Amino acid sequence: TKPYGFQAFYPGPGLGGHCIPIDPFYLTWKAKEYDMSTRFIELAGEINTHMPDHVVVRLRQVLDRKSGIALSRARILLLGMAYKKNVPDMRESPSARLMQILLGHGAAVAFHDPYVPTVPKMRDYPELFGRNSVALENVGADDFDAVLIATDHDNIDYAALARLNIPVIDTRNAFARRGLPMDNVTKA
């Protein structure tokens, strides 16, 4: 019914941005004033809130199965800090929560994001402030134990990531959509 400006939304590592993570909860709050149930919206919010935890569980499983490396000793490359592809916006980004969880488990975490060269100050993640994006062209197979794709920017050389031959946890289906080898890729 809407032929122009359609933008499909697909599951990922959690919700981000200025409206979608917040506005449904306003609707829930307002609906309660009229004694209306919004349980479906609340359940969706709970699921979306816990997606970063689910992604970390999948990452831990992959590291255990493919590398025998504990998450507490793992070196993780987080691909994408922006909340959606091809923008420099980190508002409510699930990538910040992912990095916080991984660091909390003792993992060494670096990130690459061509749109976010440095992590800005964020109220909920002050410990991430000032971290800098690493240059992807300088990354070798010995530098990281796994790659976690949180934001699938279009200007990333995913074929080069495939050649690293290390586990990739793909929360955005970036490899399959580009027809790249899936041997080391796990969807999350």
Regions found by a protein language model. Name each.
Residues T1-A188:
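Structural/interface elements that position substrates and couple domains in central-metabolism enzymes
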